[in-house]
């Protein structure tokens, strides 16, 4: 790199770092939005600044108040132009949006980035689809355990996990198991197959558990399936379960069945939760 190029790069970095006012931000995006080499250096400086904080609260404050307002306009500029290349500041914005629990923007950007086959930045031992799936899974597990609604984020991500994204089998299996558990929750958040009167919901839960078992035989779904079968038998005795109308299920199985994921999502989004302590299956 010649002296003139070096000076130009240093000036560009200075301008990118001085984006506290919106007009300066717009100018920086317009001037340097295509200069990925400069943006990459500026990005690494900001990532290092985040890592330098000693407390999680300080890191979150910086991500929310400094990093994201600075870098999201560059992300929007990148997406608007339509060119596709490995873009680390796009991926870091997704990561930090999840960190501050801005799931609407995080998922919106993540879906676009995954369609572009974006990779995680160097040093990350995961893929972007697996990262996003884990983020929403962990949040869902914690939120549902508190008896609170997990929609729309769970269903939005579940459809991608089940039908679109390439994930490790263990990750997909735990998502299928969680979806089955959510189907069996009461409005108060208690997971209890014996409290479900809709045979179709029980059949779907069994199908999800069996698919999870087929992907990972250590998924731990046997008990849930047995409880669902017991409830279906009780409904059949009372005349509330017509085995000829619904797909036949007979407990833990390696037989693959077509799962209506749209119906799963429809039932999940139609059953809001209320605050309560979690029960057992």
From Swiss-Prot:
Cell inner membrane found in the keyword field: no
Top-level division of the source organism's lineage: Viruses
Pfam hit, one: Phage_term_smal
Family annotation (InterPro entries): Phage_P2_GpM
GO biological process, one term: viral capsid assembly
Keywords for the protein's UniProt record, in alphabetical order: DNA-binding, Endonuclease, Hydrolase, Nuclease, Viral genome packaging, Viral release from host cell
One GO MF term: DNA binding
Disulphide linkage map: none
Family: To phage P2 protein M.
The protein's name in its UniProt record: Probable terminase, endonuclease subunit
Organism annotation: Haemophilus phage HP1 (strain HP1c1)
UniProt lineage: Viruses, Duplodnaviria, Heunggongvirae, Uroviricota, Caudoviricetes
